[in-house]
Amino acid sequence: MLDNIRIVLVETSHTGNMGSVARAMKTMGLSKLYLVNPLVKPDSQAIALAAGASDVIGNATLVDSLDQALEGCNLVVGTSARSRTLPWPMLEPRECGVRSAQEAEHAPVALVFGRERVGLTNDELQKCHYHVAIPANPEYSSLNLAMAVQIIAYEVRIAHLDRLQAGQPEHEESPYPLVDDLERFYQHLEQTLLQTGFIRPAHQGQVMNKLRRLFTRARPEAQELNILRGILSSVQKTHDE
């Protein structure tokens, strides 16, 4: 199961953080590190701070975009503070661990961490099914990147061990669509709404953001998503006649 957990770092600017994250991952049994457009490439400092987890660094997958890192994933959780202009379904770290361990039994799960200074952008966060916030001391809530990864990775491991102890079934088929399929649905929905005049090109972003939030909250299963796409195709066909 742990092999299905991806730790995704977006535009990391310090190689030392890559090494410290690798160490945090390996102590919890995680090995899949994805680096999205890193501002620096892993170097000797990253290897030194990995402290025995250099294999995690050496096997890291470097990609140009977040979409590439999320390809094939069934669940995506992004780290975020709670104060956002567009509210999103939130998880506590323990809930994040439980849900990640459950869904990683049948498909890859991505846990996404943002830039050291500014975190994830709103556009990046909208690609996530859930956001997770670490309830740190409000008077001093500063966590470095490796600390945040360690906390979330620990919760995933504990949830995984609990599932093993309880004898939970492994490798069950997921009812939920992959991230790629959801993105195709959103593109289809946007095309249909533009075609029917429900939204206009100058103002499509605000409506689509709210619709993304709606479907993220509802989280339709794969068969339900196919029904929705069938409805959209029917609307487009009728509109063209």
Curated annotation (Swiss-Prot):
Predominant place of localization: cytoplasm
Keywords for this protein: Cytoplasm, Methyltransferase, S-adenosyl-L-methionine, Transferase, tRNA processing
GO BP term, pick one: tRNA nucleoside ribose methylation
One Pfam family per UniProt: SpoU_methylase
Entries under Gene3D superfamilies matching the protein: 1.10.8.590, 3.40.1280.10
Compartment list: Cytoplasm
Binding of S-adenosyl-L-methionine, residues: T79, S80, A81, G114, I134, S141, S142, L143
NCBIfam families: PRK15114.1 (NF011694), rRNA_methyl_1 (TIGR00050)
Protein family: Belongs to the class IV-like SAM-binding methyltransferase superfamily. RNA methyltransferase TrmH family.
Its job: Catalyzes the formation of 2'O-methylated cytidine (Cm32) or 2'O-methylated uridine (Um32) at position 32 in tRNA.
Protein name: tRNA (cytidine/uridine-2'-O-)-methyltransferase TrmJ
Organism: Pectobacterium atrosepticum (strain SCRI 1043 / ATCC BAA-672) (Erwinia carotovora subsp. atroseptica)
